[in-house]
Amino acid sequence: MMNIWHDISPNRIKDEDFFAVIEISKGGKAKYELDKETGMLMMDRILHTSTHYPANYGFIPRTFADDGDPLDVLVLCSEDILPLSLIRCYPIGVIRMIDGGEKDEKIIAIPFKDPTYNTFKDISELPPHIFNEMSHFFSVYKELEHKVTTIEEVSGREDALQIIRTCIDTYSDKFCK
């Protein structure tokens, strides 16, 4: 059985052009995440708050982030994308958070083939409301679970590229030697 985290070609995962794996469709409340052993999606929980994911949410294969998981990605798209779909994207920014006392970075990405969004090249170009929805969601989505999340910083494309490169290198060091 294929494990989408590991078995996608490294040629398809570059800092400026990568395939994201969607775990949660925009508008969803069910929190799915990668089961690292099988490569399947596993339901982690239903969100306790009345909020829903403001964008398609997933990960970048062949990356390893500081939290021990593949690097998280929010894909801004005019359509809801089905879980376990691959979508070719480019990064426009990053949200840096603290989640449960640990660093947690979320890349903001755009599909190459979505004409509604593919004119945006940096998070600073987004309409403010789009970013405000994402920020609000990540600051409250665990509140009723009595867990604290804090947004520390939002950065543009160049910082996102650096984080992706680091997570690709960390993955390579951990799994490809």
Predicted regions and their residues:
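Hydrophobic N-terminal alpha-helices or hydrophobic patches in metabolic proteins across all domains
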Residues: M1-K177
